[in-house]
Design a protein with these regions (language model features):
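Conserved SGNH/GDSL esterase-like catalytic core that processes O-acyl groups on lipids
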Residues: 5-108, 115-122, 127-139, 229, ...
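A structural motif corresponding to the C-terminal end of an alpha-helix
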Residues: 109-121, 154-166, 207
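Conserved catalytic region of serine esterases and O-acyltransferases that act on ester linkages
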Residues: 9, 26, 184, 188-306
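Flexible glycine/proline-rich, aromatic-decorated loop/lid segments
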Residues: 172-178
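Substrate-gating cap/lid alpha-helix
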Residues: 133-169, 263-278
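Non-membrane alpha-helical structural segments and their capping/turn regions in soluble enzymes
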Residues: 93-104, 145, 149, 194, ...
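Flexible glycine/proline-enriched surface loops and loop-helix/loop-strand junctions
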Residues: 138-141, 181-189
């Protein structure tokens, strides 16, 4: 998929609407950063209209608050990214028919509108995330996931029927939540924490506006040669106890994970990676611009650090 075919395109005026998931994207800037990186030169403009607790049928606002339509027109929105389904899923199986009606009504209400004054707005539907098992705090997590999965499937089918792009966040987050001894994604089962937004933002950005892969660089301590993509080495100097070199990144750096940097194993592919092969046994410290950033054994360096 190239930028011209992607749901979000360089230069677009993007509007997010939806529930707490959308609302909190503004407090966790990973997605916005990724979209701006990938549209550098002709950057997207982002307006977040998400509101905690919003559903397709209920969007309470203070008196005299600007309408959604007036805000979309003021922003000259080219694309609307709609994040719904979590609140609606609490109605269970009996609420699916009404949710389908609401989805179709939402799509119909926007589809022909020219908020940018030139062309019909494009729509993207985004599913809710999975419900995380936090033990005694989330006793109904399996039941909740059955409901969320059903609402996600309905969103997928509805989007396909009307030719609207759909992004499934339920499947990827459900898979991550199966991990053992891995960081939790949420604070209460349904609201993502900072790490959760880091995880989800990359998947959502890849679906909206694909970008380059993180750089990978491998250095052989014995020969001094390097291989990889997305970065290159220069001014390399090697001694029996140390090595020094300059790394030139040929693309935007990947976004480091928050906190202590621990990530799910399957998400390490989203990080820039440096590996050093053929080091003598021992521990080695990486110093970047005079600041220590990582210490690892020769075995860990050979495997690569992100």
């Amino acid at each position: 998929m190239n930028a011209a075919e992607s749901p979000v395109r360089p230069g677009d005026h993007v509007a997010f609407v939806g529930n707490t998931f959308a609302d909190q994207l503004r407090s966790h800037g990973y997605l916005e950063t990724l979209l701006l990186q990938r549209s550098a030169g002709n950057p997207v403009s982002i307006r977040n209209l998400g509101w905690a607790g919003d559903t397709l049928s209920a969007r309470d606002r203070p008196t005299n608050f600007p309408t959604e339509t007036s805000t979309l027109e003021a922003h000259k929105a080219d694309v609307i990214i709609a994040c719904f389904g979590m609140g609606e899923s609490f109605a269970g199986e009996s609420g699916l028919a009404e949710f389908k009606n609401q989805l179709n009504a939402f799509i119909t209400s926007h589809r022909a509108r020219k908020y940018n004054g030139k062309s019909a707005v494009r729509l993207v539907l985004v599913s809710p995330i999975a419900y995380e098992n936090l033990g005694a705090r989330t006793p109904r997590w399996q039941e909740r996931n059955r409901d969320i999965a059903a609402y996600t499937q309905l969103m997928n089918e509805t989007a396909a029927n009307v030719g609207v792009p759909f992004v499934d966040l339920y499947g990827p987050t459900a898979e991550l939540m199966k991990g053992k001894n891995t960081p939790k994604l949420t604070d209460n089962g349904i609201n993502l924490n900072d790490y959760g937004y880091w995880c989800v933002s990359r998947a959502l950005a890849d679906a909206l506006l694909p970008g380059s892969k993180p750089w990978v660089l491998s250095v052989d301590a014995k020969s001094g040669k390097s291989t990889g993509h997305g970065a290159r080495i220069s001014q390399a100097k090697f001694t029996t106890t140390a090595m020094a070199f300059t790394v030139q990144e040929l693309a935007w750096p990947s976004l480091a994970a928050p906190g202590k940097g621990q990530v799910h194993p399957q998400l390490k592919r989203n990080l820039d990676q440096l590996s050093i092969k053929n080091l003598k046994p021992g521990n080695y410290r990486l110093v970047v611009d005079g600041k220590p950033v990582a210490t690892a054994s020769h075995i860990q360096w050979a495997a690569g650090l992100g």
